[in-house]
Amino acid sequence: MEISPYCLLSLLPIFLLSGFSLSYDEFDGHAATSRALLQTRTTCKEDFANKNYTIITSRCKGPNYPANVCCSAFKDFACPFAEVLNDEKNDCASTMFSYINLYGRYPPGIFANMCKEGKEGLDCTDVTQSASATSDSIPRASTTASLAVLSTFLVLCLLFLSS
C-alpha cells in the first residue's frame, strides 16, 4: 500500500499551523512560591524571549559548569534586570529562568544552587550595564518556521520522486 503524495501534501497545513498555537513555557509549571493563596502575579514587562543569552551560554559550559565562570556570566546577564527580577509581584524571574534553561539546556536549579553570595542574593553593585540590557535580540530561527520549511521540502521531494 502506497501513500499518495497528495495525501501528505494535504496534511502539511495541519502540521504547519499546529506549531503556532503553543508557546515554549505553556507546559511549564510556574509554582507560586512564597505567595498568598489567591495572589496573582502580573506578566513580566521585560521581553526575556528576545534577550541575548549568549552572554551565559558562551561562557557557562558543561559538563563541569565552573561556579566562578557560570555565576559571573549569570550576573552579567541578570543584574541589569535586578529590579524587575526581585519584584515578587511579577513572573519575570521564572520567565527568565525558563529561557535560560531553554537556550542553555542547563541542569535544573544550577544557578540557584551554585551562585550564592549572601542572605540578600547576588551582589550586582560591581556589575556594569551589559549587552543583555542594551541589545534586546539576536537573530534566531523560529522552531515553527524551521519545521515548516523542512516539511515543505520533504513533501516536495516526495512529489518529485513519485512522479
Curated annotation (Swiss-Prot):
Q: Which GO terms describe its biological process?
A: negative regulation of reactive oxygen species biosynthetic process
Q: For this UniProt entry, which residues form the secretion signal?
A: 1-23
In what tissue types does this protein appear?
A: Expressed in pollen, pollen tubes, sporophytic pistil tissues, in the early stages of female gametophyte development, and in unfertilized, mature ovules.
Q: What is its main location?
A: membrane
Recorded phenotype for the gene knockout or disruption: No aborted seed phenotype and normal production of seed sets.
Q: Which residues are glycosylated?
A: N52
Provide the residue ranges of the propeptide in this protein.
136-163
PANTHER family the UniProt entry points to: GPI-ANCHORED PROTEIN LLG1-RELATED-RELATED, GPI-ANCHORED PROTEIN LLG2-RELATED
Q: What is this protein called?
A: GPI-anchored protein LLG2
Q: Which organism is it from?
A: Arabidopsis thaliana (Mouse-ear cress)
